């Protein structure tokens, strides 16, 4: 798979361990993580640090076996980066693949005044294919 696969106009699929995202100037992003296999706290903290410093206060959505850990580490990392800022990095954890896919479908249908890109980052290809299929 390419490092960043374009799935439709503004939706991209990215494999967690080998993929990469390059921010586009004047675009906002929403990021959706499928995290079934990655539970290394140091790796997650490095990912959170990289993403929050690159994309700032955007929305990070998590689904999968390790979503609670990812959400907690992203929240903790955001507090380290923005300790006194009242506007927080937004994180959401979804209990089911269906609710996660529904949220992704919903945001893809919305109209935005500012160009918006959506990234589906995954560490479980089977679940990734399932979510992509549910959003078509």
Language-model region placement:
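ATP-dependent carboxylate-amine ligase
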Residues: 2-136
């Amino acid at each position: 798979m390419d490092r960043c696969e374009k799935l439709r106009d503004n939706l991209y699929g990215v494999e967690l361990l080998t993929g990469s995202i390059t921010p586009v100037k004047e675009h906002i992003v929403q990021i959706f993580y499928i995290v079934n296999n990655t539970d290394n706290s140091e790796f997650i903290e490095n990912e959170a640090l990289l993403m929050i410093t690159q994309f700032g206060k955007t929305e990070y959505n998590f689904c999968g076996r390790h979503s609670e850990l990812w959400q907690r580490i992203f929240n903790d990392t955001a507090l380290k980066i923005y300790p006194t800022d009242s506007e927080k990095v937004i994180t959401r954890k979804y209990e089911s693949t269906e609710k996660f896919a529904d949220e992704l479908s919903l945001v893809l249908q919305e109209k935005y005044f500012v160009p918006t890109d959506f990234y589906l980052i995954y560490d479980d290809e089977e679940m990734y294919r399932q979510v992509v299929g549910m959003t078509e």
